[in-house]
A protein has these predicted regions:
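Short boundary motifs at domain starts and secondary-structure transition points
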Residues: 1-5
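Glycine-rich phosphate- or other oxyanion-binding loops that anchor nucleotides, phosphorylated ligands
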Residues: 7-270
Length: 270
């Protein structure tokens, strides 16, 4: 399958189609949905093809009680088990400069929704992270393996002291679209959660609005590195490539432009 980002492109990883729509049609986006294995496979292929950077973008749950619904959080480090995976420092600084009201800190990883207040408190105690989401650890782990810069920008949709009802936990399909059937089935089994579900949806809207503000402030590349930045990072990571790059640049400056249809064409002004 042809890469959607390609060399020089900024790849965005989200969990839901709603998050992808905020980015607009020009953004190369992978939608994780509830299928972590499929997301990892697709992300691995994109990174192997080469990208300028990858960013985890979408909603998150607060672990720190000082975070409010609708706050933006910029990741400085992703905590994946015992691993601490720092985001790209320069990219993180650009994000912070463009989003002056955003909080900065760590993101915890989870392969499932962290729904109860007790679970959020336990994860905070174990990691010290500000927030949690379900995609950033995959982005961080695979980006590091491919020496690609990565960043995290997320909007808070549920507070540290807010529990998610069961209907909200089953509301995401594997393709990132709303899973209406499981939500209705959950409501039939426990109709008393309807109030909590409505509240969860309203608070999620605050998170989506925060993401829309971030998208407008950051532009379609989400403040990511450009082609030149990516080349510099690549050469810094692999000094031996400098010789190859210098050789390639030298060969790319001929004194004569060769026309394959006839004799050489002199360079204008020669």
């Amino acid at each position: 399958m042809k890469p959607i980002a390609g060399p020089g492109g900024i790849l965005v990883v989200v969990g839901m189609t709603r998050e992808a729509k905020i980015l607009g049609p020009e953004a190369p986006v992978l939608i994780g949905g509830g299928d972590a294995a499929a997301l990892a496979t697709a992300l691995e292929a994109e990174l192997a093809a080469g990208v300028a950077g990858v960013v985890s973008f979408g909603l998150c749950g607060a672990l720190d009680s000082s975070l409010k619904v609708g706050d933006l959080v910029i990741g400085e480090v992703v905590l994946d088990g015992i691993d601490r995976l720092p985001t790209d420092p320069a990219w993180t600084e650009r994000l912070a400069a463009a989003l002056p009201g955003a909080r900065r800190g760590g993101f915890a990883s989870s392969g499932r929704p962290v729904a109860s207040v007790a679970d959020k408190a336990a994860l905070l105690a174990a990691t010290g992270a500000l927030a949690v989401d379900m995609e950033s650890h995959l982005v961080a782990r695979l980006a590091r393996a491919h020496r690609a810069p990565f960043a995290v920008v997320r909007g808070v949709s549920d507070g540290a002291r807010r529990a998610l009802p069961h209907a909200a936990q089953v509301g995401l399909a594997a393709d990132g679209r709303p899973a209406i059937g499981p939500v209705l089935a959950s409501l039939r089994s426990n109709p008393f959660q309807i109030g909590a579900l409505i509240r969860t949806a309203l608070e999620a809207e605050d998170g989506f609005q925060a993401l829309e503000r971030a998208r407008r402030a950051l532009g379609h590349r989400l403040a990511g590195p450009g082609r030149v930045d990516a080349l510099v990072d690549h050469l810094a990571a692999d000094p031996a490539a400098i010789v190859s790059a210098d050789h390639a640049l030298g060969e790319a400056q001929p004194t004569v432009l060769q026309d394959t249809r006839g004799p050489p064409l002199a360079r204008p002004g020669a």
